[in-house]
């Protein structure tokens, strides 16, 4: 997976945006990472989906502006 961006939630937690391939399909991964022994490791808190769904994902996120 290639890291596109990330930001710190706390000094021990970060949110990371990655892109990569799985079974010949481009995937997007947005996941929370926690620091364990000076290394950030992925948690189950996140979402992984096909890049084919990216336009629909943006439409969903756009609705957050209305709240």
Language-model-derived ranges and their functions:
Residues 1-67:
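Positively charged, low-complexity terminal tracts
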